[in-house]
Amino acid sequence: MAVAYCCLSLFLVSTWVALLLQPLQGTWGAPLEPMYPGDYATPEQMAQYETQLRRYINTLTRPRYGKRAEEENTGGLPGVQLSPCTSPPVGLIPCSAPWS
């Protein structure tokens, strides 16, 4: 019983520490916007703010790859890839177009 209690408490403490060491993130896992250092900040503080702001903007605007990109030509069916001729018509381009 004492061994089980010791293992459980060690597991809970290690989980708690691991959660505390995670970087702070906002809603839906987005990073928090950096705080503006103020109008009277030193050039070093402004440079650090600029670096953090650039990283924040790049994180929010980076292109997303993966599942969303793969679902473009599936017709709503998972695991099925449709040819351009069987896809729903988008414009007036015929199926025998040389670029399709």
Curated annotation (Swiss-Prot):
PANTHER family given in the database record: NEUROPEPTIDE Y/PANCREATIC HORMONE/PEPTIDE YY (PTHR10533), PANCREATIC POLYPEPTIDE PROHORMONE (PTHR10533:SF2)
Subcellular location per the Swiss-Prot or TrEMBL entry: Secreted
* UniProt signal peptide: 1-29
Q: What is this protein called?
A: Pancreatic polypeptide prohormone
Q: Which GO terms describe its cellular component?
A: cytoplasm; extracellular space
Residues annotated with Tyrosine amide modification: Y65
Gene3D superfamilies reported in the protein's UniProt record: 6.10.250.900
SMART domains, A to Z: PAH
* Recorded family membership: Belongs to the NPY family.
PTM annotation: No icosapeptide-like peptide is cleaved from the C-terminal.
Keyword Signal set for record: yes
Where are the bilayer-spanning segments? none
Which lineage is the organism of this entry classified under, starting from the top rank?
Eukaryota, Metazoa, Chordata, Craniata, Vertebrata
Keyword Secreted assigned to the entry: answer is: yes
Keywords, ordered alphabetically: Amidation, Cleavage on pair of basic residues, Hormone, Secreted, Signal
**Top-level taxon of the source organism:** Eukaryota
**Source organism per UniProt:** Mus musculus (Mouse)
Annotated GO molecular function terms are: G protein-coupled receptor binding; hormone activity
